[in-house]
Amino acid sequence: DLCVSAVISTSKSKEFVMKVGVNLINFGPGASPDSIKRWAQLTESLGYHLLMTSDHIGIKPDVQGRYPAPFYEPVSTLAWLAGITTTIEIGTTVLIVPYRSALEIAKAFANIDQFSGGRVILGVGIGWAQEEFAGLGVEYKRRGAITNEYLEAIKLLWTQDLASYEGRYVSFK
């Protein structure tokens, strides 16, 4: 089963553009490198605009029914998809920002953007699974503030040759 999603964006001319894509199933009994590759290439050959992956790092037993094993990590999956597709945009439906460092996210997505010829999309969110946050040692109640700060830092890293940032959750020079 595939979940079709749509993204609406505006250009500088204020025209609306709808892009239709597929949320690639990167988890569960049907997920395997072979099936992911087949779905990616089929989706691209059918002319879809987007191929998106889901994110979870540590699946706890209480939600394992929703996200059964295996669960392929989305960032490394996107790097692989960049090499086996040529035109379709690739990205995350929601990358749970507080699960990774701001520097790691910025570097990984900058690399994938280069590998893919500018086809990567970073979809982000704050997350909802309290047990997953606990397992990763991230404070659940601060996930919104962490996400906001990380996104500020990531933007600086992507737009400045020599970036520096001093915040509560991330600092670099």
Which positions does each model-derived feature cover?
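N-terminal beta1-alpha1-beta2 module of alpha/beta enzyme domains
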Residues: 14-84
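Structural motif corresponding to the early beta-alpha repeats
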Residues: 79-83, 89-98
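Internal, glycine-rich beta/alpha segment that forms the wall or movable "lid"
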Residues: 15, 61-65, 98-173
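Short, low-complexity, charge-dense intrinsically disordered segments
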Residues: 1-3, 7-13
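Active-site beta-loop-alpha junctions enriched in small/polar residues
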Residues: 25-27, 56, 95-97, 125-129
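A structural motif corresponding to the C-terminal end of an alpha-helix
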Residues: 46, 84-88, 153, 157-161
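Hydrophobic faces of well-ordered beta-strands that scaffold small-molecule active sites
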Residues: 20-22, 51-53, 90-92, 120-124
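Acidic (Asp/Glu)-rich catalytic clusters
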Residues: 44-45, 79-86, 109, 113-119
